[in-house]
Structure formats: structure tokens, C-alpha cells
Amino acid sequence: LIEQTRETLVDMGKLTPKWQQAALKPLASPKLLRVGSVALAIANKTGLLPDRLGLPDDLPIRQEPLVASGDDVWMFTGCVMDAWQRDVHQATQRVIEAAGFGVRPTSDAAPCCGALQSHAGMGSEARKLATKVMRSLGDKPILVNSAGCGAAMKDYGHLLGTDEARAFSARVFDVSEFLADHVDKFPTVKP
């Protein structure tokens, strides 16, 4: 209800100014997001940005790519999470692999779930991104380590209102939720 109201207010020009809408566009473009993130990291590390922006001090300038180890599950990497916290994805992938699953990071194939656009009342853009994500990922389980992305993707059935979207959402799991259901796959550790 709140996001539908926001979308109506955006359409009326009463919420989310054009500059904010424009600022969200690079999230759907991995190359633009990487370039912008590196520029932000450099500006932040050199003290060019005010502290009130609240940017993390450890924004990465360079990151190692995520490499697929199989195709048992998708690991959704998203936009901001991948650009600013790829180390969390790397740790997540190691844990999933320890449970015996091959992992295929989504990376550029599905770069943005549309959660931020939806929250900003940009429903049309959120629906486009949701459709792109759904078309990009096969029929394997999709594991997510970002609560915002996971909640948005589990809501695609409601956002798009199709059986296809509802079936897709049923394949989305928080990584902890998925691993809890497969705890028997982990190797036994002796004290």
C-alpha cells in the first residue's frame, strides 16, 4: 500500500524529485555503478566528501571478481551490495560451497532487483528491473544475502501480479533460510 501510494505521488510530481530518480538510474547499469562507486571511494578516501553523507570509510576501489563454482544455486549479487560489499558475497559463497553446493553469482546478468526504485515510488522502473531479473535467472534456487533485495524479490508476485512472478518468488531464499534447510550437508566438525 505504501509503495503504491508513493508511486502515485511520484506520478503527480509530489515525491522523489527528478534528480533523485536520475541518481537511481546507475544502479541498473553495472558499469556506471562501478565507475561511480570507484569515484565515490576515491573522493571519500581523499576527504573530498563531507562526513554527513554517511558513506562507509572502507568503500572498495578495486574488487576481485566473483567466480562461479557450479550451478546448483544462484547467488543474487545485486547493485549496491555488489559494488560496496562484495566481501560479504565472497564469504557467503564460501559458506554455500562448504555445504556442497555449486554457486553461480548473478553479477551483470541480473544487476539490480528494483527494491530502491520501488521504495522511491518508481514502480514502472521497479517492474522493468524485476522482469529483467526473472528473465535472466534459470530455474535453480536463488539465494540472497541482502534483506532488502530478498524482500523485494519475494514480492515480485505481488509487484507484477503474474503466476510466473509468483513461481519465481517461491525460488528466492535468504541464504540463512536455505542453509538451515540443508544443515545436514555441512561437514561434521570434531571438537
Question: Predicted segments — roles?
Answer:
Residues 2-191:
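Iron-sulfur cluster-binding electron-transfer modules in prokaryotic oxidoreductases
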